[in-house]
From Swiss-Prot:
Coiled coil: none
InterPro entries: DNA-binding_RecF, DNA-binding_RecF_CS, P-loop_NTPase, RecF/RecN/SMC_N, RecF_2
Stated name of the protein: DNA replication and repair protein RecF
Similarity comment: family membership: Belongs to the RecF family.
Organism domain of life: Bacteria
Encoding gene, per UniProt annotation: recF
Assigned keywords, A-Z: ATP-binding, Cytoplasm, DNA damage, DNA repair, DNA replication, DNA-binding, Nucleotide-binding, SOS response
Location within or outside the cell: Cytoplasm
HAMAP family: RecF
One GO CC term on file: cytoplasm
Gene3D superfamilies: P-loop containing nucleotide triphosphate hydrolases (3.40.50.300), RecF/RecN/SMC, N-terminal domain (1.20.1050.90)
């Protein structure tokens, strides 16, 4: 999977710009606040129909403009195809091959990306919410079924929380509706949990050898999925549903008193263990960075396995955060295999032969200078 061209109109600090992309490495050089990260963000947004930096799409529209547009031409093994995204102050519209998609679940997955930025180090040391978002963003790109199940779960979770709040305040008294919601909640909670557990298992199988390679076999990495709803995965679907319903039933009074759902995938977490120790609590900064790098490289391989195409890699000012050995391992792994976009203030710190086959663009105040 390659991005051949990227066109922006009224996106952030860009007026109109077209980037003809190199199939291997594209390096965007410039001082801070010139638009390097905005350009990478536009590729991410084109892929996932949402920014990783803001939940407010209006912020993506250039000041005093009415709309923003992102368009990219992609090449796959079987041919080329354009993707288009229009953003207005009333909403957004996405197109695949010039055909409007009525649902985002039909759109997401045509362009797969892996983003690695300094804040991604928080996947290890940050909050459970960051790790849940990581699962949803990566798994959602390779499984439209997961995206749909997650959307249904979030819809029912919102309904259930609203009803629990009404019960807590005494505005509702009938528990029959809560039981109905719990039945629907359990069905999609099980589906989301199942797919997350399988994803983490697959990711671990790829991350372990990568981590061992980076550390010269001095460290062993393991990933542990920590679901809020604990049930026996070996059971059949009916037995698992019954087990989840039992948990929800036993805690119905607690949830009513608290006015919120206390169990479900929205409270899941992942732990990353290095040599049997939790990297979040006991890992050094170097171990946490190696773990994050191993996970990102494993994502790339997993996407290729699942969809038959390597994703596009977005490295947002992250090379400066990696020491020479980690940087070399990253660049050697992706060389001639993964189309990559790199933002940096200087290429002086990039000491790798990958530079011999890279295209450099200088970014200055929302303009691209070759």
């Amino acid at each position: 999977m390659k991005l051949n061209t990227l066109q922006l109109e009224n996106y952030r600090n860009y007026d109109e710009v077209t980037l003809k992309c190199h199939p291997d490495v594209n390096i965007l050089i410039g001082e801070n606040a010139q638009g390097k990260t905005n350009l990478l963000e536009s590729i991410y947004t084109l892929a996932l129909a949402k920014s990783h930096r803001t939940s407010n799409d209006k912020e993506l529209i250039r000041f005093n403009a009415d709309y923003a547009k992102i368009e990219g031409e992609l090449s796959y093994r079987h041919g080329t195809m354009p993707l288009t995204m229009f953003i207005t102050k009333k909403g957004k519209q996405v197109k695949v091959n010039h055909l409007e998609q009525s649902r985002l679940t039909q759109y997401i997955g045509h362009l797969n990306v892996v983003l690695f930025a300094p804040e991604d180090l928080n996947i290890v040391k940050g909050s459970p919410q960051i790790r849940r978002r990581f699962i949803d963003m990566e798994l959602g790109q390779i499984s439209a079924v997961y995206l749909n199940d997650l959307a249904q779960y979030q819809r029912i979770l919102k309904q259930k929380n609203n009803y629990l709040k009404q019960l807590q305040l005494g505005q509702k008294k009938d528990l029959t509706m809560l039981e109905v919601l719990n039945q629907q909640f359990a069905e999609y909670a099980m589906k989301v949990t199942d797919k997350r557990a399988h994803f983490i298992q697959e990711l671990e199988s790829l991350a372990k050898p990568i981590h061992a390679g980076i550390t010269n076999d001095k460290e062993a990495l393991s990933l542990n999925y920590l679901p809020s709803l604990k049930f026996d995965y070996a059971q059949n679907e009916a037995a698992r549903l019954e087990e989840i319903m039992s948990i929800l039933s036993d805690n119905m009074q607690r949830e009513k008193e608290r006015g919120i759902s206390l169990f479900g995938p929205h409270r899941d977490d992942i732990s990353f263990d290095v040599n049997g120790m939790d990297a979040q609590t006991y890992g050094s900064q170097g171990q946490q960075r190696t773990t994050a790098l191993s996970i990102k490289l494993a994502e790339i391989e997993l996407m290729n396995i699942e969809v038959g195409e390597y994703p596009i890699l977005l490295l947002d000012d992250v090379l400066s955060e990696l020491d020479d050995s980690r940087q070399t391992h990253l660049l050697s792994t992706i060389q001639h295999k993964v189309q990559t976009f790199v933002t940096t203030t200087s290429v002086d710190g990039i000491d790798h032969e990958i530079m011999n086959n890279a295209k450099l663009y200088r970014i200055n105040q929302g303009e691209i200078i070759k």
